[in-house]
Amino acid sequence: MSEPLPPAEWGLVDLSVAEPGEDLVAIGGGLVPGTLVSAYRQGLFPMNVAVTGHGGGRSEALGWWSPDPRGVLYPASLKVSRSLASSVRRMDTSVDQSFVDVVRSCADPHRPHGWITEEFVDAYAELH
């Protein structure tokens, strides 16, 4: 049995006071397992955001997002087209074979403002 996760290291945002239509609801905090799990349970996910400092310089900060409206997939209602079903039959599927490699493959280093950095890879690997 795994050890219980530590609590979030900072107070997460109360979404009931978030402005309607605002997707970015907080900036800051850290990517430790307790914070990640607490955030996901509250409908938040982390993704870096570009910020402009007082001198006009730009940098990245950890943003916490809760899209409004949020896209939700209901598996029981999912309609799979024939072309998708055909494509899926030609694929190999596995579970828990190479978690870190999969996360790294989701990162696109050539994409401007790509947010899956090594910090994210390490955080999700620790959580996994």
What are these model-derived regions, one by one?
Residues M1-H128:
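N-acyltransferase acceptor-side catalytic subdomain
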